[in-house]
Amino acid sequence: MTRRGLTLLELLLVLGILGVLLGLALPLLSPNRLALDQAARSLATQVTRARLEAIRRNAFVGLQVFTEGAGGYLLFVDQNANRRYDPGEEFGATHFGQGNWARVRLDPEKSALGNMPLLFDPRGIPAKPITATLVLTSGGATRKVVISQQGRARLE
C-alpha cells in the first residue's frame, strides 16, 4: 500500500523554511528600503546625465548637492562660465523628504561633496577629479553613491 500526501512533520518543516525565508526577505521589501534604493539609483543616474549633457551641449554642466532640509541635488548648465551654480541655471532638481521619497535624507556628515559642485567639462570629464561619496538614509538603512575621479557613479 502506497501513501499519498505529506506527513505532519514534512508540512511543518516546509512551513518553517518558508517562515525563515520570509523573515529574511521582509526587511528588504519595506517601503522605506525601496524608496531609498530608488533615490540612490536616481542620484547615480543623474550624475551620468550631467556628464552626457555636458557633451551634448558642449558646455560645463554640473550637479550641485544641497543639504538644507532633507537635502537634494540639482543639475545646472554653467552659462556664465564661473564654474559654480547660479540661480536660473538649473534644468533639473530633486528634493528629498517629499513625495515618494518622504523619509529619504541626504546625510551631510557622511557625504563628502559639500557645497562644491560636481562639474563636467564639454568633453564629459570632471573639471576637478575628485572621489566623492554621497550617503542617503531612510530610517536605519543607508545607501552610498560613490562618484569616481572619472565621473562615474556606483552604488554601495
Curated annotation (Swiss-Prot):
Where on the chain is N-methylleucine found, per UniProt? L6
Signal sequence region:
none
Which Pfam families is this protein grouped with?
A: GspH, N_methyl
Q: Which parts of this protein are propeptide?
A: 1-5
Q: Where are the transmembrane segments?
A: 6-29
Question: Cellular component terms, GO, for this chain's entry?
Answer: cell outer membrane; periplasmic space; plasma membrane; type II protein secretion system complex
According to its UniProt entry, one GO biological process term is: protein secretion by the type II secretion system
InterPro entries for the chain: N_methyl_site, Pilin-like, T2SS_GspH
Q: Which cysteines are joined by disulfide bonds?
A: none
Keywords, ordered alphabetically = Cell inner membrane, Cell membrane, Cell outer membrane, Membrane, Methylation, Periplasm, Transmembrane, Transmembrane helix
Cellular compartments annotated: Cell inner membrane; Cell outer membrane; Periplasm
PROSITE patterns named in the record: PROKAR_NTER_METHYL (PS00409)
Topology class, membrane: Single-pass membrane protein
Tell me, according to the record, the phenotype of the null mutant: Mutants have a wild-type piliation phenotype but are deficient in transformation.
Top-level taxon: Bacteria
Q: What does this protein do?
A: Plays an essential role in natural DNA transformation but is not required for pilus biogenesis.
The name on file for this protein is Pilin-like protein PilA1
Species this chain originates from: Thermus thermophilus (strain ATCC BAA-163 / DSM 7039 / HB27)
- Taxonomic lineage from the root: Bacteria, Thermotogati, Deinococcota, Deinococci, Thermales
Q: Which gene encodes it?
A: pilA1
